[in-house]
Curated annotation (Swiss-Prot):
GO function terms (MF aspect): actin monomer binding; phosphatidylinositol-4,5-bisphosphate binding; proline-rich region binding
Protein name, as recorded: Profilin-1
Organism domain of life: Eukaryota
Matching InterPro entries: PFN, PFN_euk, PFN_sf, Profilin_CS
Location of the protein in the cell: Cytoplasm, Cytoskeleton
Subunit structure, interactors included: Multimer. Occurs in many kinds of cells as a complex with monomeric actin in a 1:1 ratio.
The organism of origin for this protein: Zea mays (Maize)
Highest classification ranks of the organism: Eukaryota, Viridiplantae, Streptophyta, Embryophyta, Tracheophyta
């Protein structure tokens, strides 16, 4: 299965009638493996800051998580495994796997819990596969 198929069928899938706004799978080095059409263009330093928060949980708390120029307030995640952010009626979930970051961005009517479910389910599957 291609990485694009994972994005299209597993991240951008319908859940309770709703979809993520955008999603991507990005390598730990910041290289995009696959993304949805609406996924924001991000700067290398934004991805580096996200990776640093996985190594040093709490690193992003003072500044927020920034992706594609959009700033999200960091809310409780799972240190070293999941970063969650909120901005207005939407937000972001980032799940770290052995080789990649699974990123989902949502807005209402999708809920934070639905975004977490979609992103973390794929991330857990990839971890089980050694990826």
């Amino acid at each position: 299965m291609s990485w694009q198929t994972y994005v299209d069928e597993h991240l951008m899938c319908e859940i309770e009638g709703h979809h993520l706004t955008s999603a991507a799978i990005v390598g730990h080095d910041g290289a995009t493996w696959a993304q949805s059409t609406a996924f924001p263009e991000f700067k290398p330093e934004e991805m580096a800051a996200i990776m640093k928060d996985f190594d040093e949980p709490g690193h992003l708390a003072p500044t927020g998580l920034i992706l594609g120029g959009t700033k999200y307030m960091v809310i409780q995640g799972e240190p070293g495994a999941v970063i969650r952010g909120k901005k207005g009626s939407g937000g972001i979930t980032v799940k770290k796997t052995g080789q990649s970051l699974i990123i989902g961005i949502y807005d209402e009517p999708m809920t934070p819990g639905q975004c977490n479910l979609v992103v973390e389910r794929l991330g857990d599957y990839l971890l089980e596969q050694g990826m």
